[in-house]
């Protein structure tokens, strides 16, 4: 660990989870849900020190009495007041640092509205008095973490999925594709198909239970039709899950029907292409000379790529789309849930990166627009 006096902070604000820690570390110190919860009921016990709002794990543990909101939807910050609370919680409660003493590296999804990035910059400098900051593209950081400079990253988190082709360290902006289909949509879909089984999950708190079912039991089928037939013929694929109240529910084909929506968005009533086709289209938008290198370096990143079986299925689907002579390789690092953060930690600790920071002085001279000039 480099001296914590001035070491940079790396904060990866995902739609679902916030990952935060110090540059140079190999894993984030704090990982907590990007949730702000407000009580749904009137407090009656005076002197209990009840708060009017809870953030992160505390909101998660009191979810039964709270209404939970996610300030980031589809990778875009939609509620800035709540987002400020999340950042405040990150700096003061989780990392226990004074933000005015450390440079901060933040992350964002590609193809985000420009205003989103400007407002992030403004809040860091004006609310938290950061000495310096930088905004990096999530997928680029994942590639850093995998130790490559060329490849196509499929980054799929809770709010947004995107494919970013990178060649020799340069992202190719014309070929970046974004798919507003990710973990949260899969959770909602699982809620819907569990209702068909007669299990009702409706509140924001119950959605969190379904998310846990999804993370523990779902997987990607190599051959969907065949798997459906197996599930119909026998109970070999069924698993049980105990709810917080002790009730046990059984889930069968829902286990692989849920993530199948990544490959067949029509399940969710969406007209977009599946993730495999999105990757393929993204590669096809690149120059013909570099496609071969991209096919050989498909890097998966983000929590929604954590399903067992997803790499094999991607291999199968992309092989079917690509020219037959081409070598296709899917790289699924075991730490891919945090690879954006890890990449940020690597980037912020590089000596060559130190001149890239936007300083408070530069911000005071040029205003929030500087972020477009200094960050890719």
From Swiss-Prot:
N-terminal cleavage of acetylated cysteine of immature actin by ACTMAP. Oxidation of Met-45 by Mical to form methionine sulfoxide promotes actin filament depolymerization. Methionine sulfoxide is produced stereospecifically, but it is not known whether the (S)-S-oxide or the (R)-S-oxide is produced. It is an enzyme of class 3 (hydrolase). It holds the Pfam family Actin. CDD domains: ASKHA_NBD_actin. Its main location: cytoplasm. It catalyses: ATP + H2O = ADP + phosphate + H(+). GO terms for biological process: mitotic cytokinesis. GO terms for cellular component: actin cytoskeleton; cytoplasm. Residues 1-2 form a propeptide. The modification Methionine sulfoxide is found at residues 45, 48. The keyword Nucleotide-binding applies. Its EC number is 3.6.4.-. The modification N-acetylaspartate is found at residue 3. The modification Tele-methylhistidine is found at residue 74. It is found in: Cytoplasm, Cytoskeleton. InterPro entries: Actin, Actin/actin-like_CS, Actin_CS, ATPase_NBD. Keywords: Acetylation, ATP-binding, Cytoplasm, Cytoskeleton, Hydrolase, Methylation, Muscle protein, Nucleotide-binding, Oxidation. One of its GO terms (molecular function) is hydrolase activity. Belongs to the actin family. In Drosophila there are 6 closely related actin genes. Actins are highly conserved proteins that are involved in various types of cell motility and are ubiquitously expressed in all eukaryotic cells. This is Actin, larval muscle.
